[in-house]
Amino acid sequence: MTIEQAMELIHGVEWRGSRPGLTRVRELLHRLGDPQDGLQFVHIAGTNGKGSTAAMLASILRAAGYTTGLFTSPYLERFAERMQVNGVPVPDAEFAAVCEALQPCIAAMDDPPTEFELVTAAAMLWFRRRGCDVVVLEVGLGGRLDATNVIAAPACAVITNIGLDHTEILGDTLEQIAREKAGILKPGTRAVSYPQTPEVRAVLHEICAQRGIPLAEVDAAAIVPLTDGVDGQTFTYRGAEYTLPLLGSHQLRNAAVALETVTALRARGWRIPDAAVRAGLAQVRWPARFELLRRAPWFVLDGGHNPQCAQTVADNLARYFPGRRITLLVGVLADKDYPAMLAALDTQAAAYIAATPLSPRALPAAELGDYLKRFGKPVTVCADPAQAAELALAHAAPEDVICAVGSLYMAGAIRMDLRRDHNENSGH
């Protein structure tokens, strides 16, 4: 099977959307020989910070000498990014080979699996074939009925920041959403949580008590920022000092979640030296999360797509670029709470460029442009995200800031274009 045929198999399934429930993925994995049963997992659910926390943990475990799988979604530039071993995305030939193994299993099923179920099963088979010691597994949506929750009790279950997102599927209160996310907490695991709101904490404590699961929570007061700049930050947590290249105070809280997870794994007998923890955090890369792509003019990229993320971006812009003229290049999906996102971001905007993310669910740039006019600032409409980025750069003074925000679907297109541009101009 070629990589093109493999992608056709994955994208050609009848069910593109979400169909909660574990029966299909269970059957599919069983037909594949249950590859997940031979693997150890760190399972991560939450609204925001899942990917960053997963990247930090994978980096730490790799530095500690473990062959480490990482499963995340969605991807930015290439589908293969969704599954990696030791920081390297799945090679085309290996992905095609696991898809070939899936084909007869799918054909034998009465109820065909969804795209996400296929990707999850393909990843499990590939991680098993690659002999992973541990897989850092990010939930696709929710937790309880997410395809990744087909695994037995993981070594550690991690709950990152919980907020309101995907309310049409997960429920419209924080408590309901927390119950869905807490579906990954299985008897026999250890749980770690981000510093949550009181109602979310109450749910996590109740469920962990019911299931006899030890719960470690990040102590926000034990995070002490030391230095902070556009090249990264240093901080101490519970007295030990670390360097983190990711920007924003929320990343310190995500790093503290990773550190508490290390403590939980050590309690289970995992060997993770302090030096590996420091090296893992110092080396972590996680693109499109307040990522600095250019200087003079400054170009910041963030794939955040809900009001919490937008507030974080606004805070970071104020923190790292005070007093500078900021143009916001915005693209959003029509089904997101973009009015609340834009209200948070507008505090930092001098001007706007509206673009259309590469998704069938995108809000057209012209419609977004009309909406942005209410803020009383200059608005330009340029549907193509990469062209919008070029336009913004062409009109910016060297000291100005451009921040592209609102959707990972837009971030990927811009990142690919700007990096290609940079490589061509520098002769790489």
Question: What does each of the following model-derived ranges do?
Answer:
Residues 194-216, 230-232, 298-299, 307, ...:
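C-terminal helical cap/extension that packs against the catalytic core
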Residues 111, 118, 131-138, 154-241, ...:
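Acidic, Mg2+-coordinating active-site environments of NTP-dependent enzymes
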Residues 74, 194-195, 207-229, 245-249, ...:
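Beta-strand->loop->alpha-helix junctions that form or flank phosphate-binding loops
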Residues 131-133, 323, 397-399:
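Short, high-confidence coil segments that cap the C-terminus of an alpha-helix
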Residues 38, 134-137, 145-158, 162-163, ...:
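Nucleotide phosphate-binding/pyrophosphate-handling subdomain across enzymes
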Residues 18, 22, 26-37, 63-152, ...:
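ATP-dependent carboxylate-amine ligase catalytic core
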Residues 1-48, 52-67, 76-78, 190-193, ...:
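N-terminal leader/targeting and accessory segments in enzymes
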Residues 407:
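Active-site-proximal loop/hinge segments that shape catalytic or ion-binding/gating pockets
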